[in-house]
């Protein structure tokens, strides 16, 4: 017997007996439905030898199931006018689809089939390793991406939060079907999954549909607790003479995702560098003309977080940009934020 935990406005939550959580939000007037299958396990759960495997499995789930080929997965979604995508983060993996409500069952069947019955064939792995290696090269060619990776590596140097989500060429080349299947078997279990639907959806009917497909999944073993994370503020530099610009990251620790004060962090992020009206954009780009891109970004995790400011400028104006950023930080620390702002 499934148990309804929450019914607030149009949002309803149910947990199946095997631990699988289902959340729906009914949106009156909508004719479409957005589906999400969320895994509470990203690159942070990997060992050093496994680094990149969460992202690689995300790719491999599109490479055919016991019931569908790669082409059939793509064709069936296109045939119903649907859309599907996936992404891997440091603490989650997401598979999502959007379709008209009349095709919701078909879209969910495709997503759940990918998640429950992947093939992990060696011949597919060889091709996908090539794809991911090209993705890594693309990141290596991006100064902005490398600045972010350098920050993570140094800031969380003793935790997997500091590792790249894509992994390294060495780890990606080492993956094999048995390794993928074992990792998938440990992590893709009901207690670690969340199913969501928003749009034209009736909660009871959606729960019944999910239960019929995934209610028989075995619980699996609970994942071990994550180690306590520490941060290491420091100065780090990486030189690449072929580039025209210097990329800058200035970051500080923030509250974790579930902290009561996180909303203040979101507001601070918006005021500092969240858009064209932000202080950093208006002062350093619009008034001084020192940069093209400048923004701030908030990265919140279960037990850690960081607020980072990113900018790109000519090497000759780097000191002025750093000085201007620090001036804005001192200003927001020492002076009140106006009601209008």
Placement of each model-derived feature along the sequence:
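His/Glu-based metal-binding/catalytic segments typifying zinc-dependent metallopeptidases
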Residues: 27, 36-38, 222-279
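A secondary-structure boundary/capping signal
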Residues: 39-40, 197
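Short amphipathic alpha-helix segments
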Residues: 279-287
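Active-site SXXK
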Residues: 52-65
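Short pre-active-site segment immediately N-terminal to the catalytic Zn-binding motif
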Residues: 41-51
């Amino acid at each position: 017997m499934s148990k309804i935990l929450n019914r607030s406005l149009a949002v309803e939550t149910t947990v199946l007996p095997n631990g699988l959580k289902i959340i729906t939000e009914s949106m009156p007037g909508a004719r479409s439905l957005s589906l999400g299958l969320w895994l509470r396990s990203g690159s942070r759960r990997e060992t050093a030898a496994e680094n990149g495997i969460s992202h690689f499995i995300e790719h491999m789930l599109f490479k055919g199931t016991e019931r569908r080929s790669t082409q059939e997965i793509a064709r069936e979604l296109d045939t119903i006018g649907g859309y599907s995508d996936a992404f891997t983060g440091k603490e989650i993996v997401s598979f999502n689809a959007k379709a008209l409500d009349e095709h919701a069952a078909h879209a969910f069947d495709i997503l759940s089939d990918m998640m429950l019955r992947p093939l992990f064939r060696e011949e597919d792995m060889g091709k996908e390793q090539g794809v991911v290696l090209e993705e890594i090269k693309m990141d290596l060619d991006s100064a902005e991406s490398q600045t972010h990776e350098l920050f993570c590596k140094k800031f969380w140097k003793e935790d997997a939060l500091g590792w790249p989500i894509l992994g390294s060429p060495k780890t990606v080349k080492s993956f094999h079907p048995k390794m993928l299947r074992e990792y998938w078997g440990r992590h893709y279990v009901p207690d670690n999954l969340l199913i969501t639907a928003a749009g034209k959806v009736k909660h009871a009917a959606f729960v019944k549909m999910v239960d019929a497909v995934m209610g028989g999944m075995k619980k699996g073993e609970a994942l071990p607790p994550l180690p306590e994370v520490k941060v290491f503020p420091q100065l780090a530099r990486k030189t690449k003479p072929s580039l025209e610009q210097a990329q800058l990251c200035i970051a500080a620790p923030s509250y974790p995702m579930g902290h009561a004060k996180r909303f203040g962090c979101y507001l601070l992020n918006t005021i500092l560098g969240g858009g064209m009206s932000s202080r950093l954009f208006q002062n350093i780009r619009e008034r001084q003309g020192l940069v093209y891109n400048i923004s701030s970004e908030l990265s919140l995790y279960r037990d850690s977080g960081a607020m980072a400011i990113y900018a790109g400028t000519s090497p000759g104006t780097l000191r002025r940009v750093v000085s201007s950023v620090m001036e804005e930080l001192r200003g927001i620390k020492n002076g009140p934020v106006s009601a209008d702002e």
